[in-house]
């Protein structure tokens, strides 16, 4: 079975989407080595299947797709957002992608409002979370809009206008953790604004200090 480790990771973590996105919307993927496929090294990924409950598929069902969009393996059809995942994986630092319609982040997205640096934890994904311009879901146009927004903002996450949120990371656990961070910060921002308050934003210098401290954080 090709990309077995990555497919198992998709099955293991897919249920976590249930806490982040309604119904069967949203998707996640993990980049594989590609060494055991016809794709080149790093040029294939395992992704959640389309339209299936998060606990409704097994390892052999998980689709494997090349970064060129070609379906390589898996009993089920891949997510409709394959173009988005394929485009983002052009960035060599990306090892996993999580896409949700989580309510607080999506509330910002439908208002076309980026998430500013109101809390130091935003540095988990960058200095702000931009909004990618709207395009129909599952299209190459949307995929390119997302890549452009993240690249221009220097962010590993982006809101998607009138749609939702996408977060990238070197691994799936970090991508999911950072998705929760963005959702939490979006809630803080919107609740502060709803209370008639004006959230204060951190300066670039303050954010740089946080980034330096993060380099020595953890075990």
Swiss-Prot record:
SUPFAM superfamilies: AraD/HMP-PK domain-like. Its EC number is 4.1.2.-. Activity decreases in the presence of the metal chelator EDTA. Its cofactor is Zn(2+). Keywords: Carbohydrate metabolism, Lyase, Metal-binding, Zinc. Disulfide bonds: none annotated. GO terms for cellular component: cytosol. GO terms for biological process: pentose catabolic process. It holds the Pfam family Aldolase_II. It comes from the Archaea. Zn(2+) binds at residues 81, 99, 101, 163. The active site is at 81 (proton donor/acceptor). It catalyses: D-ribulose 1-phosphate = glycolaldehyde + dihydroxyacetone phosphate. Residues 20-42 are annotated as: Disordered. GO terms for molecular function: L-fuculose-phosphate aldolase activity; metal ion binding. Binds 1 zinc ion per subunit. Belongs to the aldolase class II family. PANTHER family: 3-OXO-TETRONATE 4-PHOSPHATE DECARBOXYLASE-RELATED (PTHR22789:SF0), FUCULOSE PHOSPHATE ALDOLASE (PTHR22789). Aldolase involved in the non-carboxylating pentose bisphosphate pathway, a nucleoside degradation pathway present in some halophilic archaea. Catalyzes the cleavage of ribulose 1-phosphate (Ru1P) to dihydroxyacetone phosphate (DHAP) and glycolaldehyde. Can also catalyze the reverse reaction, condensing DHAP and aldehydes. In vitro, can condensate DHAP with various aldehydes, including glycolaldehyde, acetaldehyde, propionaldehyde, isobutylaldehyde, DL-glyceraldehyde and DL-lactaldehyde. This is Ribulose-1-phosphate aldolase. It comes from Halopiger xanaduensis (strain DSM 18323 / JCM 14033 / SH-6).
